[in-house]
Amino acid sequence: DYIAGMLSDAPHTRKIRPGMRIAITAGSRGIDHLAVIIRELVSFLKEQGALPFVIPAMGSHGGATAEGQLAIVHEYGVTEEFVGCPVLATMEVVKIGELDVGRPIFINRLAAEADGIISLNRIKAHTAFRGSYESGVMKMLTIGLGCQQGAEVCHRQGILHLGENVEKFAFGILKNANVLLGVGIIENAYEQTAVIRVMTGE
């Protein structure tokens, strides 16, 4: 009810139309109540007539294989039976653009083929780099949806440039892909869900 209330009380549903296939990201980090949050999001989207599905979005984690990444999200309870929609995985990527320095922007093929994307992730400070956007919905776009190839391109300049590259690639994805919403989760000091916020792609 909490998630549905946030979505229905805001202008976020204007872009969600019946029949739209919408990809929801699920990462490799253990997020409190992840499966429940995804289930409620799926339920709301289905009420709008959309056709949601979940994709593991975790760069090269899970051994950089679709099977390995599916196993990770299944361990977190994100299964078709629980969340109420297909849970699909691929490591194939599609080039959707380039940065001004000629570096390719890659995203997961399933996300690229969807009518819309919802980037869902926990927002927190990163342990290895600093930047305007650290761990959160923007890094999920760049590293998570980038799969192994996208993550490698972003990391190529080293950890010192990772903060700026996460931002650059994320804005490139926002420009070239239909990112409908971001769902940001903030946990308290006990790693319990404290705040959930929904943002438009803009």
Model-derived features with residue positions:
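An N-terminal, well-structured beta->alpha segment
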Residues: D1-P18, I31-A35, I118
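Short glycine-rich or small-residue beta-strand-to-loop segments that form or flank ligand, phosphate
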Residues: R21-G30, F53-M58
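Short glycine/serine/threonine-rich phosphate/pyrophosphate-binding segments
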Residues: I31-I38, G63, H126-F129, M140
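Active-site histidine-anchored catalytic micro-motif
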Residues: L51-E67
